[in-house]
C-alpha cells in the first residue's frame, strides 16, 4: 500500500494513534447494585447529568441519587406517605416537581439539591396529568386539579400561580 500524499499519511497516523489509545485504556465499566425492599417506579434522569429520581410506590416517597445510582437518599422535603408522583420539566433539565395527595407540593430548580414548597387551591387531578408546561417559559405551568365536595369532584385549572418565580 502506497500513501502518496501527506493527507494519506496523516489519516494512517491518526487511525493508528486512536487504536493505540483505545487499547491502552485500562478503565473498565463498573456496575454497582442497590437492593430495595420495593420495586422502584418511574426512574428518571435529569437530562445531561448523573442525577436520578424515582418513586417508592409502597411508602409513597421519592429517592434521589447524584452519582448515577451508586448511592441513594430519600428526599426529605416531601412528607412520607403523601407523594403521588414526580414530574420532570420537559423544557428545563434542572426542574422537577413532587406532586402530593394534598394541596402542598414541592419543586426544584437545581436537580433536586434543594426543594421549595408551593401550595395550590386544589388537590392534583387523578383524571389527567397534574402539570402542563409551556415550551418557551419554564415558569408558565398549568396545574390541573380537583375540587371535591362529598362524592363529586370538579376539575379546576390554575396558571401560573405558585410556579411563577417571585424573586425576579
Predicted regions and their residues:
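Extracellular glycan-interacting surfaces
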Residues: 2-168
Amino acid at each position: 500500500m502506497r500513501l502518496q500524499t501527506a493527507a494519506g499519511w496523516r489519516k494512517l497516523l491518526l487511525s493508528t494513534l486512536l487504536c493505540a489509545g483505545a487499547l491502552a485504556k485500562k478503565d473498565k465499566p463498573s456496575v454497582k447494585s442497590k437492593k430495595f425492599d420495593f420495586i422502584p417506579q418511574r426512574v428518571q434522569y435529569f437530562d445531561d447529568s448523573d442525577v436520578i429520581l424515582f418513586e417508592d410506590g409502597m411508602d409513597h416517597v421519592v429517592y434521589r441519587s447524584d452519582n448515577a445510582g451508586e448511592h441513594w437518599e430519600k428526599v426529605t422535603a416531601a412528607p412520607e406517605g403523601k407523594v403521588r408522583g414526580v414530574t420532570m420539566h420537559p423544557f428545563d433539565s434542572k426542574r422537577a416537581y413532587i406532586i402530593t395527595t394534598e394541596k402542598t407540593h414541592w419543586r426544584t430548580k437545581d436537580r433536586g439539591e434543594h426543594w421549595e414548597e408551593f401550595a395550590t387551591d386544589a388537590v392534583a387531578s387523578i383524571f389527567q396529568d397534574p402539570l402542563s408546561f409551556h415550551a418557551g417559559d419554564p415558569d408558565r405551568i398549568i396545574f390541573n386539579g380537583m375540587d371535591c365536595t362529598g362524592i363529586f369532584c370538579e376539575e379546576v385549572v390554575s396558571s401560573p400561580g405558585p410556579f411563577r418565580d417571585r424573586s425576579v
